[in-house]
UniProtKB/Swiss-Prot annotation:
This is Pyriculol/pyriculariol biosynthesis cluster transcription factor 1. CDD domains: fungal_TF_MHR, GAL4. GO terms for cellular component: nucleus. SMART domains: Fungal_trans, GAL4.
Length: 742
């Protein structure tokens, strides 16, 4: 083909003189073409020379009218809110005054059209906004982003922001957290251990918190054992479950199952949780699974973390939940029934954690949003919930695996909605009602009415949904409810004549509480929920008890207190580790100081020589003497002792001052501070071997995927160190992990 012919051909296509291009072969070989056809290169190669044709001209993009209209609408909204940079006070005042329904007392006014708020989905995350203006702007911005993304030839990588490490997380997790880029597979348990930890969680932890949907989550454990890559939020959730399972195990059990101790397991799995959450960027990437993992993690920190820091961390959880709209019921937001129910479970667990951590931190006010309407979870088994369900979830008649959570939710809601009720537990006696600031008779009567209402609602719940024959969880729940109401009512009863001050009353309550704790420990040593009982231990109240003993040398109540201290310490040997914390050092010094004063008082005033308990001998050897210098032996100190604590005969003293043997070395370290809002030890009198339920084994319920009322029956206790027993329990889930353990 000649050059002229090529030019003519090109000209007929474009309609104007085109730029002469290199031939196809020269372009392909990336060599210089002389742009004559045939070119010299093609002639030498003896091949056909084909001229290139220019690419079709790109159509000129017209201005996007829709985009411009949306921008103009955003500008109008902003001008309406703040023209010339100043808000239109008159217009805002008019809008507020036009609201037909006034909000409840103490709540901020919300526009009628924005009563329920709105969820904003963006970049794989969800945020809640209750501002009409902002929700409208977010809608417009999202629509504009969709337009721009649709026009772009290269779509943006949606996962890039999701995988960006969250640098702010160091504010919560410290500098020892593994780097986000690290391989979390190194922290994963082995395939066989994964199934064992999952079963421990189902048996011991899940019945008490009910945050996850077992049938939906279980396939991920199968994938984890196969080494398949998991979504980052699922990975974080699994690590949080491993952590809670390790918390529920004793050191001996952990060593038998995993091959390493409990503390090593907690450090390993906690590091996995933190690394996964940081890799997700949990402070800016919000989804239900990530929040479940974070809540599980905070539960595992109870007792292992400073109580004030725990309250601060729980504030982060509340803000994330609020940003996701968890505080608004899913029915108001148009969410599917399954998601609505799971959000309810999560919110009430957060609510329980908030009031407990607030009270443990010494705060009476809550960080909860002033406007929340999330309904309480329904009485349904996990098998009754289906992710694809379209009908609203309804309560199931009869016993289910939710019974314990339903009771704790009622109690938590009562405490949160009854601020100011705590003082009446201390200011009920006739002698102290005149103290400035004491509640009036009318206020006490009002609170007693509220407590009667709580008692009635709890009784209705247990009568309707609780059946002792349905297993130990239901027995546990019945006694839990009875203990709460009994302790509250006892606190409201008039005190005896020996109670002189509210401090005396607190001392009496502390002694009775820890006496009940000892009984519950002794009767529940082989129960799957014993770990949970131990986590109820109130360190601060125990230190208060020791402080009172350092000022009260003798008396019937003092004798009971010393006996209780000696019975408590075998279950909490971590308290004897003086170098572990300043709190432990303070406790040890108070105990040594109190025993020294008691010895001297009984020797000089009563002629009795006491046998020194082994724990006192140990503490004397490790506590610096500067911490135990005391003036309690002086007459002025003894004169300050309440009369009730000095009135004791030689015979009574010799009977009451007996010392038991050495501490039982079989108990491992379980740390306190978990659940204790309305009462210092709400589980303190639970006896799961109560003769009211003869023949019922003391064990936890293993949740079943297809559980019915008849399925939730007592079975033999699971020994999690025995693979055969654990393998049998997996039959109900359709899994045979035996081969994975070999």
């Amino acid at each position: 083909m000649s050059s002229a012919a090529a030019s003519a051909t090109a000209g007929s296509v474009t309609g104007k003189t085109p730029r002469i291009l290199a031939c196809v072969l020269c372009q392909h070989r990336k060599i210089k073409c002389d742009r004559s056809f045939p070119c010299a290169n093609c002639q030498r190669a003896n091949v056909q020379c084909t001229p290139s044709t220019p690419a079709p001209a790109r159509k000129r993009r017209r201005p996007n009218q829709d985009l411009q209209e949306r921008l103009a609408r955003c500008e109008e909204l902003l001008k309406e809110y703040a023209p010339d940079g100043k808000p239109d006070i008159a217009r805002l005042t008019t809008k507020r005054s036009s609201l037909s329904q006034s909000p409840p007392k103490g709540e901020e006014p919300l526009p009628e059209w924005n009563r329920h708020g709105k969820l904003i989905h963006e970049d794989g995350s969800v945020r809640f906004v209750d501002s009409y203006m902002l929700s409208t702007i977010y809608d417009e911005l999202r629509a504009m982003r969709d337009i721009i993304d649709h026009d772009e030839s290269t779509p943006e990588d949606e996962s890039s922001d999701y995988m960006t490490p969250d640098t702010n997380a160091d504010l919560l997790f410290g500098g020892d957290t593994p780097q986000p880029a690290g391989n979390s597979m190194e922290l994963q348990p082995s395939p066989g251990h994964i199934f064992r930890l999952w079963q421990v969680f189902l048996d011991r932890v899940n019945p008490l918190i009910k945050l996850v949907h077992v049938p939906s989550l279980q396939p991920y454990f199968v994938e984890a054992t196969a080494g398949a890559p998991l979504p980052k939020n699922i990975e974080a959730l699994l690590f949080s479950i491993y952590t809670l399972a390790a918390v529920s195990l004793s050191d001996a059990e952990c060593t038998s199952i995993l091959g390493y101790g409990r503390e090593a397991a907690l450090h390993r799995f906690s590091s996995g949780v933190r690394a996964s959450l940081i890799r997700i960027g949990f402070l800016k990437t919000h989804d239900l699974t990530t929040l479940q993992a974070l809540v599980h993690y905070l539960i595992s920190l109870q007792g292992r973390y400073n109580r004030h820091a725990a309250w601060v961390l729980n504030g982060v959880v509340i803000r994330i939940a609020q940003k996701m709209g968890i505080h608004r019921d899913g029915t108001m937001l148009g969410l599917p029934p399954f998601e609505t129910e799971m959000r309810r479970r999560l919110w009430f667990q957060i609510l329980s954690m908030e009031f407990k951590t607030a009270l443990m931190s010494g705060l009476g006010h809550s960080l909860l949003p002033r406007v929340w309407d999330t309904q309480e979870p329904k009485n349904v088994n996990d098998a009754d919930l289906h992710p694809s369900a379209t009908e609203p979830v309804k309560d199931r008649e009869g016993p289910t695996e939710m019974i314990f959570v339903l009771i704790t939710n009622k109690v938590a809601r009562f405490i949160v909605e009854s601020p100011g009720i705590e003082p009446i537990f201390l200011y009920h006696d006739e002698k102290v009602k005149k103290i400035p600031g004491a509640p009036s008779e009318e206020k006490i009567k009002e609170f007693r009415g509220l407590i009667d209402g709580l008692s009635k609602s709890l009784l209705e719940l247990t009568d309707k949904y609780c059946d002792p024959a349905a297993g130990p969880l239901h027995q546990y729940t019945i006694e839990f409810q009875d203990i709460i109401m009994q302790r509250i009512r006892e606190s409201l009863e008039p005190g005896d004549a020996t109670i002189e001050t509210h401090i005396d009353h607190m001392f009496k309550m502390a002694v009775e509480s820890f006496e009940s704790t000892v009984v519950s420990y002794r009767n529940s040593c082989k129960v799957a929920y014993l770990w949970f009982l131990r986590l109820q231990f109130h360190n601060d109240l125990f230190t208060f008890l020791a402080g009172q003993l350092s000022q009260r040398p003798s008396g019937p109540l003092v004798d009971r207190a010393w006996e209780t201290v000696e019975n408590i310490l075998p279950y909490h040997p971590e308290l004897l580790k003086v170098n572990a914390s300043k709190e432990n050092l303070l406790l040890a010094s108070l105990l040594v100081k109190g025993w020294n004063m008691r010895e001297e008082y009984c020797s000089t005033q009563m002629g009795i020589t006491l046998n020194t308990p082994p724990y006192i001998e140990h503490l004397r050897s490790v506590v610096p003497q500067d911490y135990v210098k005391s003036e309690n032996s002086s007459p002025s100190a003894l004169s300050r002792i309440p009369k009730a604590n000095r009135m004791v005969t030689r015979e009574a003293a010799s009977d009451q001052l007996s010392v038991s043997g050495p501490m039982d070395p079989t108990f491992d370290e379980f740390i306190g501070n978990y659940l204790d809002g309305a009462d210092w030890d709400v589980f303190s009198r639970i006896n799961l071997e109560n003769p009211a339920f003869p023949g019922v084994p003391a064990t936890g319920i293993t949740p079943q995927v297809n559980a019915t009322a008849s399925d939730i029956l007592p079975s033999t206790r699971i020994d999690h160190t025995d693979p055969n027993q654990t393998s049998h329990q997996f039959a109900m889930y359709g899994i045979d992990p035996q081969s994975a353990w070999q």
